[in-house]
Amino acid sequence: GADEDCLPRGSKCLGENKQCCEKTTCMFYANRCVGI
């Protein structure tokens, strides 16, 4: 489902076709998804 098509916490997020999973956000200067 849509929930699985996302980047888990700790994944690189810049230049990816997916967005960070729910309750995470892309920290651009660290280039990774972090929990919010």
From Swiss-Prot:
Q: Which GO terms describe its molecular function?
A: calcium channel inhibitor activity; toxin activity
Q: Which UniProt keywords apply?
A: Calcium channel impairing toxin, Disulfide bond, Ion channel impairing toxin, Knottin, Neurotoxin, Secreted, Toxin, Voltage-gated calcium channel impairing toxin
Q: Which Pfam families match?
A: Toxin_30
Is Cell inner membrane one of the keywords UniProt gives this record?
no
Q: Which InterPro entries match?
A: Assassin_bug_toxin-like (IPR012325)
Q: Does the keyword Secreted apply?
A: yes
Primary site of residence = secreted
Question: What cellular component terms from Gene Ontology apply here?
Answer: extracellular region
Could you tell me which cysteines form disulfide bridges?
Answer: C6-C21, C13-C26, C20-C33
Compartments, record wording: Secreted
**Functional description taken from the UniProt entry:** Binds reversibly and blocks N-type voltage-gated calcium channels (Cav).
Family per record = Belongs to the venom Ptu1-like knottin family.
Regarding domains, what does the record say? The presence of a 'disulfide through disulfide knot' structurally defines this protein as a knottin.
Annotated protein name in UniProt: Toxin Iob1
Instruction: Record the organism.
Output: Isyndus obscurus
